[in-house]
Swiss-Prot record:
Principal EC category: ligase
Gene transcribed to yield this protein: guaA
InterPro entries documented for this protein: Class_I_gatase-like, GATASE, GMP_synth_C, GMP_synth_GATase, GMP_synthase, GMPS_ATP_PPase_dom, NAD/GMP_synthase, Rossmann-like_a/b/a_fold
EC number: 6.3.5.2
Protein task: Catalyzes the synthesis of GMP from XMP.
Complex formation: Homodimer.
Source species: Geobacillus kaustophilus (strain HTA426)
Pathway(s) annotated for this protein in UniProt: Purine metabolism; GMP biosynthesis; GMP from XMP (L-Gln route): step 1/1
Segments forming domain GMPS ATP-PPase: 196-385
Keyword Ligase annotated: yes
Gene Ontology, cellular component aspect: cytosol
Record: active site: C82 (nucleophile), H169, E171
Stated name of the protein: GMP synthase [glutamine-hydrolyzing]
Top-level lineage group: Bacteria
Family matches, as Pfam families: GATase, GMP_synt_C, NAD_synthase
Length: 510
């Protein structure tokens, strides 16, 4: 497919993914690439324009990130943001100097030149600055578009070559007209049409999957989570009964989850789903184990063995579907990433399983995967399912995992989810669940002394799960949840609410 694209070069900014996402919100496809990408690779991508992201370096640092100089010979529009503008200025013969003081936060810029980026926008704008260096003399051919009290060149342009630079961050919401400016670059400067939609994405992926698979057989490990569900339905749309899904019920799922998965995929989507009831097998392996890391390893390894056993029964499988997301690719693959993560989308499958991978979601962000799921007709309760750990309730039962304890977590968690949804808070809270700490306490129920379990409620708000704050659930909602749990769930006489942020605590207790 010859789709239009804006390429974003990653120079290490904390906002680089945000630039890509903003452009996609305009209906234009965009990809984030390492700053080391060669000019000929960009040409092969059929890019309509290039954006240089910000970054923590100074252009004068010995280890400063730079780019292939041939990029400036491609004849493509370029927008440099923050460090990206400084790099352009430095490379093209302008002057970059250390600022007398680092500028961080909101600033007021004055527009001095009615370039295409600023045409029709206010002469005074609030923007978001975050820089230690600044451009003090523009390169030849560039006009100064805007200034601020502490930044003599807050924006510059060479309209003949369609090259622009802004010292501020238009991708951040604090830059009031930032979105307008980015739109002007994408549509008016680069000439994009804005026809990248989920419908187009589905059509293109269906074509690619059919081309890749031909008449061969495909396997998918279905967890019931958002990513594996959307990937499975998309692949099924492309190749139908050539796809077989394996759903391992390890007995550590939430209430009604296994039934919901089977109903949705086997009945609604008419997919080949093999359900493996492995509850006894997992509980036997977990007997007497209290260490959380050991529990994780046992559950992860056992999942592999069960999946491997089932896969071995199937003949002629050549492909494996994985729900890898674009964020996984970015975090694992860019040279500027601060943290490298390894991602195991199906629980870390054995290396000797010689399958060719199908990763239909590996160009999408999480919110786009949800939009795709909705477009494919997947029910809201799956599309909007919260993050759920691979080991499931095995790490929400602290200490040894038993059937009795799992039942307490299952029932209390179901009450929590029901009441949160009833209160209209289910889309506001990032994640909410109950935990069973390995403690009992004294209580009084029906005039009799009790010595029973405590249930903890954990609910957090977050953007990406990296940091989180405890959710301010209204007292009356908490009261209803607590009353129902102690009245409806056997062996519970106390409910507590975890009011710790991340950091210092993690979202999960184990």
């Amino acid at each position: 497919m010859n789709q239009e694209m804006i390429v974003v070069l990653d120079f290490g900014s904390q906002y680089n993914q945000l630039i890509t996402r903003r452009i996609r919100e305009f209906g234009v496809y965009s990809e984030l690439h390492p700053h080391t990408i060669r000019a000929e690779e960009i040409r092969a991508l059929n890019a309509k324009g290039i954006i240089f992201s910000g970054g923590p370096n100074s252009v004068y640092d010995e280890q400063a990130f730079t780019c292939d100089p041939a990029i400036f010979e491609l004849g493509l529009p370029i927008l440099g943001i923050c460090y990206g503008m400084q790099l352009m200025a430095h490379h093209l013969g302008g002057k970059v100097e250390k600022a007398t003081h680092r500028e961080y936060g909101k600033a007021l810029i004055q527009v001095k030149n009615d370039s295409l980026l600023f045409h029709g926008l206010p002469d005074e704008q609030v923007v978001w600055m975050s820089h230690g260096d600044l451009v003090t003399a523009p390169p030849a051919g560039f006009a100064v578009d805007a200034t601020s009290p502490s930044c003599p060149i807050a924006a510059m342009s060479d309209e003949r070559r369609k090259w622009y630079g802004v010292q501020f961050h238009p991708e951040v919401r604090h830059s009031v007209y930032g979105n307008d400016l980015l739109k002007k670059f994408v549509f008016e400067v680069c000439g994009c049409r804005g026809d990248w939609t989920m419908e187009n994405f589905i059509d293109e992926q269906v074509r690619r999957i059919r081309e890749q698979v031909g008449g061969k057989k495909v396997l998918c490990a279905l967890s019931g989570g958002v990513d594996s569900s959307v990937a499975a339905v998309l692949v099924h749309r492309a190749i139908g009964d050539q796809l077989t899904c394996i759903f391992v019920d390890h007995g550590l799922l939430r209430k009604g989850e296994a039934e919901s998965v089977m109903k949705t995929f086997r009945e609604q989507f008419q997919m080949n789903v093999i359900k493996v009831d492995a509850k006894d097998r997992f509980l036997a392996k977990l007997k007497g184990v209290t260490d959380p890391e050991q529990k994780r390893k046992i559950i992860g390894n056992e999942f592999i063995y069960v999946f491997d056993d089932e896969a071995a029964k199937l003949e002629g499988i050549e492909f494996l579907v994985q729900g890898t997301l674009y964020t996984d690719i970015i975090e694992s693959g860019t040279a500027t990433a601060q943290t490298i993560k390894s991602h195991h989308n199906v629980g870390g499958l054995p290396e000797d399983m010689k399958f060719e991978l199908i990763e239909p979601l590996n160009t999408l962000f999480k919110d786009e995967v949800r939009a795709l799921g909705t477009q494919l007709g997947i029910p809201d309760e799956i599309v909007w399912r919260q993050p759920f750990p691979g080991p499931g309730l095995g790490i929400r039962v602290l200490g040894e995992v038993t059937e009795e304890k799992l039942e307490i977590v299952r029932e209390s968690d179901a009450i929590l989810r029901e009441e949160v949804k009833k209160a209209g808070l289910d889309r506001e809270i990032w994640q909410y669940f109950t935990v069973l700490p390995d403690i009992r306490s004294v209580g009084v129920m029906g005039d009799a002394r009790t010595y029973d379990y405590t249930v903890a409620i954990r609910a957090v708000t977050s953007i990406d799960g990296m940091t989180a704050d405890w959710a301010r659930i209204p007292w009356d909602v908490l009261e209803r949840i607590s009353t129902r749990i102690v009245n409806e769930v056997p062996h519970v006489n106390r409910v507590v609410y975890d009011i710790t942020s991340k950091p210092p605590a993690t979202i999960e207790w184990e």
